[in-house]
Amino acid sequence: MPRNAEAPAKGTTADDFAPTQWNIIYLLMTVGALMAALSISIQPLLLDKIFGIAFEKEGAVNADIQVVAEIVSIVCVGWFGLLSDRIGRVRIIALGFLIAVVGAAVSLLSLQVGLAFGAAGLVLFYLTRVLLTVGADTVQLQLSTLVGDVSSRANRPRLMGNLVFMMVFGGTMLAAIVMQMADYPGGVFLIMCLPLLAGIAGFQLTRRNLRDVAPPQPASEDDEHPLRQVWTVITSDPRMQLAFAAAFYTRADVIILSLFFSLWCISVSDLVGVTRTFATAHAAVMIGLLGLAVLAAVPLWRSFIERHSRISAIGASLSLAALGYIWLGMFANPFNWLVALPLLMVGIGHAGCFVTLQVLTVDASPKPILGAMVGAGYLVGGLGTVMLVQSGGYYFDALGPRAPFILMGTGKMLVTLYAAWLLANGIDETCDHHLKSARTVDWKPLVFLTAALPFVWLVGRSVIEGYISNGSLGEAPVGFVNRYLGDWAFTFLIISLAMRPVQEITGIKTLAKYRRMIGLFAFFYAVMHVLAYVALEWALNLGDMMGDIYKRPFILLGLVAFALLIPLAFTSANSQIKRIGGKRWKKLHSATYVINALVALHFILAANHENGEPYVYAAAVIVLLWYRFHQWRGGNVLRALRIG
């Protein structure tokens, strides 16, 4: 079992840090947040003016780039979190700055290729966004962990609040000021140069000024795997379950607003008679106002969480942000300065939730696995970002530019209801921030609600917008709805396929009871995907469908995969396992490997040349299938990777 979360490590008090080192930490956090914010804020303008992406594809392509960057970042940054417990935080921070420097250098190359060849430079831009996201997120995560190492329960809200303050200052206020250069000749080039210079400066400052304070935790064969320890902490503490559910929606706040508010301004710029560079600068100003709200609210929330329950703080901050998002979704014109009011609400809510999550995670984490716990929180937030940005991109193109904000608002309301349910059932903190009872909570309701949310939101939004009022979704939205449902089916297939390797790597056997639930959601979204194609796209016209399949043979691959998935779904119950027999059931369900391969090929052939997302999904399938094949041949992947 993990050691006590507050076991003191010698020489790790806040007083052991000189004021100069604290200033360096805050400065580096500002630099890391600035690099991340600039790469996101400039993206819509580059895709529109440099790479020539068509207006009707802007939402999906912007979302795809962010999704690819987040998927790669989840893997890399999560691994760095585990590694930092063994080799220290400072080395990983320096590595993060180096990765960002490489990404910034590639971005300048992609700019020149884009100017010369248009969309041909998009591949390099994908690489740029991946490297900058991995580098900047690594820096911010490890700096938070370093402050967690040196803080105590008494001063943690203040220190974490200061860190969040500087991160928001760099990611919103400072980024908003820098983005004003976009409206001037040569301004875009200067903006793209700044992450390169900032990364080099951050690397030098890290090497010369930072030092680790927590002793490295060398790996031992007798120790429980860190991920298993993380799971133990989360499952034994309902506050952490709430915190991770909130992180799913909170980390995406700035990304969603920076990306889709900028896209919204650009998409209507011609209608209101302004240039697209001016629209980008205007969006940056509004995001800067959001950042100002966060900065002003951090001290207030810091005081609140010192005196009140963290569960109450999460619920209150999430509900405020949710109302702000829903209000923002009701505006028709992003250039109406009244949109600042809901943005201020989102900013205040984001500040409370983010600070509370940081403090609660460090409070509940045993010191030896603090890096792994913070990394797990990043993993959940990254998965949320992937799912929300992916959905937001489709909604932006199919249902309008305000749709992503409604998505965020409804998701936050869902977690708010979960917080209210905990409080209503007597799960709360004492005055010194310890749980009043040792009651544990099953994850199944939360997993079910989260997995069902994309479909519920799609149906609800379609009804609100009137797409179903006349019995038809209309020609334009059908393609997006069909693709959206197919993406979710494939996403849940991959998650289901990945759960057994994760279970074997971590030793967390309880994951098995969620695997079939995830698999059934994959089948559900696959059914919706097929129905959308058959009923909405072709209105049950078999002749036209056959002609379409002849022209686009990849559809046949999808239908074969769906046919193979049907018996797996109908034999998933425990009663069917007993009826069929365990060995025959396992042999039948090994068809999931073929299904994933077929769907990956179907996805690649269906995608356009501007979309790199299918290749990332396919790479994930290849890695997982390689793992299963190696295990089937008698190899020990875990021992080969030195993680089992």
Swiss-Prot record:
Record PROSITE patterns: MFS
Main location: membrane
Organism: Paramagnetospirillum magneticum (strain ATCC 700264 / AMB-1) (Magnetospirillum magneticum)
Function recorded in the entry: Required for correct biomineralization of the magnetosome; probably converts and then transports some form of iron. It is partially functionally redundant with MamH. May function with MamX, MamY amd Mms6.
Superkingdom assignment: Bacteria
Any one GO cellular component localisation term in the record: plasma membrane
One annotated GO biological process: iron ion transport
Gene3D superfamilies xrefs: MFS general substrate transporter like domains
Extra information: This bacteria makes up to 20 cubo-octahedral magnetosomes of about 45 nm in diameter which contain membrane-bound crystals of magnetite (Fe(3)O(4)).
Protein family: In the N-terminal section; belongs to the major facilitator superfamily.
Keyword set includes Cytoplasm: no
Major facilitator domain: region residues: 1-427
UniProt-recorded name of the protein: Magnetosome protein MamZ
